[in-house]
Amino acid sequence: MFFSRTLSFTLVALLVVCLSQKAHANVEQKSQSPETRLMQCPLPEFDDIAIGIPEVVDSTIRISSSQASIQQDQIALFNGSVILVDKGQKIIADQLSFNRLKMQIEAIGNIHYQGKQINIFADKLSASKIDKSTEMTAASYQLDGNPGHGKAGKLSINSDGMMSLVDSTFTTCLQEVPDWQIKASEINLSAKGDFGEAYHAQFRVLDVPVFYVPYFSFPISKERLTGFLYPELSTSSSLGIEFTAPFYWNIAENYDATITPRYMSERGTQLQTEFRYLMDQQSGKIDLEYLNKDKKIKTNDDPRYLARFQHIGTFSEDFRAYIDYTTISDDNYLVDIGSKQYNSNDAYLYQIGELAYFGEQWQATLQLQDFEVLGDHQSSYKTLPHLELSAQQPLNFLSGQFELYSEMTNFQPSEKDQVSANRYHVEAGFTFPITRPSWFLNSEVKLMHTYYQQDNISAGSSLEETVDRTLPKVRIHAGVNFDRQLLAFGQSYRHTLEPQLQYLYVPDEDQSNIGLYDTTILQDDFHGIFRDTRYSGLDRIAAANQFTWGITSRLLDEENLEIIRVSLGRIQYLGENNTDLANDALLTDNGGIDNKQSSVAADLFYRINHQWQVSGDIQYNTLEDFTNKGQVNLDYQINKYNLIQLNHRYTRNVSGDSLEQASLLTSIAINENWAFVGRLTQDLQQDRSLESYAGFQYESCCWAVRIAYQRHINSNLDAASFVSEGREQFDTGISIKLIIKGLDGKQSAIGTQEMFDKSIFGYKRPYYLQN
């Protein structure tokens, strides 16, 4: 069923693409660069107004004009194309006078003042060399390298470079009638041009007053400044009306915090805080989300919260530390409240602390790890602690290497009635990797010994208190690379044929007396069939006496860009695989193997042209004629602003049920102002929508707005103590976000990636292991 549906899906996709696009061999034009789709917002540029006049490095003033005269031996008068150059400033005017005794400059007519951070045009200028101040009237100004500009009845610059604008305006809109502007009795701009302050300010839209504030400060540059960030308004059936107003606190150069009150009409008011720190070779952040009382929870008054601590640091060239710890009040917090830390469909929270040493020949890792499992998913074991030691020593023959790996792990269960265990493992052996341009031969022989000490074993269990397991492993993996030049469709290609063969031997041993602590079955895709184990962890080491064959063929163009890749492979068993999996429900391979051979694993990639590409993989059981797993993807991408991704995937027997889903994701830059992002995810087995998301964004050079609609299925992970009233099967909502460019230091809008992130499934860029 899946195989035919997937084949039809692929053929239809290819037909649509081929009808609308030329074949790859006939396409010469490459995709547009991302810049061709960007909105152009050119900033006013001003040339040096004193070209040809040397710069001043001391207190000297240089003046050039058409005419000059001196009055009373103290006032110098200049007329016609006057240019004054002083330290840090330059002035053009029709007329200018300089009083030598008062050290005063007066200028009138077509004044252009050019400072380090600003260009000003005015009718009149007065400057004092004594107190190093400048004052202009009827002025208009333009910040340098910034769209910020405006007008002022009077503009003053003090000795520190701080600008004070009386009866003034500020905007980042370049048109004659700006979409928005601040009109204030006074605006102060810092000397560095990084922030501004407005007093008795009106915020105007199309020159119509919208609201009034007695005072507010705003960043102009990208420097981090304390103040409110943009609020966001949304609605949903679960939260009601939601409003967030983040406040950014620039505590110090290497510390900052964001404090966000989050009002939810159906739940209450939540406080979100994020604290970040950056030190020498150390960085991290602490996130806390706290809701004192959820109005929808009637069973108790307990608070609902999420806390997360992340840290990464190095202590020298050899030592590294890593921490990621999250705790949560209840299993359904992410579903009911939502969080920026995790998606609402996440089933567990990561909790890990790690200290690692990396030497030239020795490596060591000490790790504490746990997973906080949400809902009725299979509980996991804590590793308290997990210690790894590994070493490598080159040999003097056959490019060989001696390798040693050992670990000690203490497994602590989540439930009191579960088995606990200590596991000690060591494996040592020799590897001989030989790699040449046209072939490779990798061989290894190792001896693996594992010791288990298991406690709290229930009566009637097949587990034993102590278990010793010693197994050898032999692995030989070889491959050959053939290539030839191929002329097709009038173009030259390089065609490769890459067969490979692997032999793996591990003797059979009954392991049903060992519990499952960190072991699960791994993917048997094309790359997975060449692994030396079928399982993660060490609780099961599958018996193997098998050959794995595989072949890959590629077509590459003259730029060595991969056009087509086809891979096919399978495991052939020389003897029966008797590793006892009868009681290991988690390790069931869903019919992926029989006593003679595994499922066929295939992988396909086809770059139709520079914009379109198709990829897919499948694991197909030829003996019983069914598909274990498979997926197919169709990707169209001109640049990060224009893309389409169509995906279909199938997995047989996931938790007793098959999974089959199809999804469509698209991002379209309609023009330089409008963009659209949409996503649809459909459960084909249950014939229901899992998620619908549509977002429109309008962006101009000085403001942007995003309006989005989302509807997604709700999980239900309720514990008895947190039963939410009125939880619907689907959560539906609308959100709106407005950005006034230039009032937060950013010159770009929200971006399509942020809209993708709002989707519970997100966007996965095409990734190809062999590309």
Curated annotation (Swiss-Prot):
Family statement: Belongs to the LptD family.
Subunit organization: Component of the lipopolysaccharide transport and assembly complex. Interacts with LptE and LptA.
InterPro entries: LipoPS_assembly_LptD, LptD, LptD_C, OstA-like_N
GO CC, one annotated term: transporter complex
HAMAP family for this protein: LPS_assembly_LptD
Purpose: Together with LptE, is involved in the assembly of lipopolysaccharide (LPS) at the surface of the outer membrane.
GO biological process terms on file: Gram-negative-bacterium-type cell outer membrane assembly; lipopolysaccharide transport
Name of the protein in question: LPS-assembly protein LptD
Sorted UniProt keywords: Cell outer membrane, Membrane, Signal
Chief localization: membrane
Species of origin: Colwellia psychrerythraea (strain 34H / ATCC BAA-681) (Vibrio psychroerythus)
Signal sequence interval, chain numbering: 1-25
Subcellular location: Cell outer membrane
